[in-house]
Every structure is written in structure tokens, then in C-alpha cells.
Amino acid sequence: MKLLIVALSLFAATLWCAPSFAQQPPRFPIDQNKLAVGAKEKTPEELKQMMANGSKFMLIDVNPRAQFEKETIPGAVNIPLEEIDEGLKKIPKDTVLVFACNRGPRSSQAAKIAEAAGFTSTTFCPIMKWKEEGNKTEAGKGKS
């Protein structure tokens, strides 16, 4: 009988806690080896064409500030991934967004977060691929 009471108590406690976990989808920590499913990648060549054509877009580096200050794609502003929800609230929903990070997992996740927030044009471009194609980077300078 005691075993049954303990089992039912544990079951009830699990049900009581479950809704609080279900309300917030996990975003962090991000698996640094996987891209977000469904995020659209922009090639470095496509990004260069956007820059050369004077296309209106916002390039957002989602790396931590220390990494951004060491190296980023020219013209990027810094909104670290951990602050992306708040940062997106300050940007008009019709803005074309291109996210960047070192290898892609953070920026692809940011693109999906922006899409879920109502932005319709979101892509990402890894900084490593940008550099592999011979493009220059710069130190981020307090742009956020």
C-alpha cells in the first residue's frame, strides 16, 4: 500500500510540474554542431551581391560581444543570441535580416527565432564560409 501511495504521489508531482516545462521551448544551449532545421543559408557570394547592389538589409552578428569585437563581417551589428528576443523587438518586422556567427548554428537558430517572431525574410551566413571565399572581416566596433 505504501508503494502505491508513493507511486501515485510521484505521478501527481510529475503532472503538476509538466505544464511549466511545456510552456517554454528550449533554445539554449545550442548544439554547436547542428544548424537549425529549416533555416535558409545565404552564400557569401549572395551576401556580397546584396552589399554591392545596395540592397536594404540588416546584418546581425549573434556571437558573444567578445567574439564580435575580434572579428565579424563588415557592416554587421552585434546582438548576441542570448539577447536576440529583446533585440528583435526594436527592429521593424519588414526588415530583411541576415544573421552571422562563426560556423552557422547560432545564426541559423537566430533566423528561426526571428521567423517565429514574425519576420518574413531571414537568412544566415557563417563567418567561416565568408572568410574561406577570401572575403575580409573586421573587428566589431561597439555596434549593437
Where do the protein language model's features map onto the residues?
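Rhodanese-like catalytic fold shared by cysteine-dependent sulfurtransferases
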Residues: 2-8, 18-45, 50, 69-96, ...
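Structural scaffold elements adjacent to functional motifs in cytosolic proteins
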Residues: 59-61
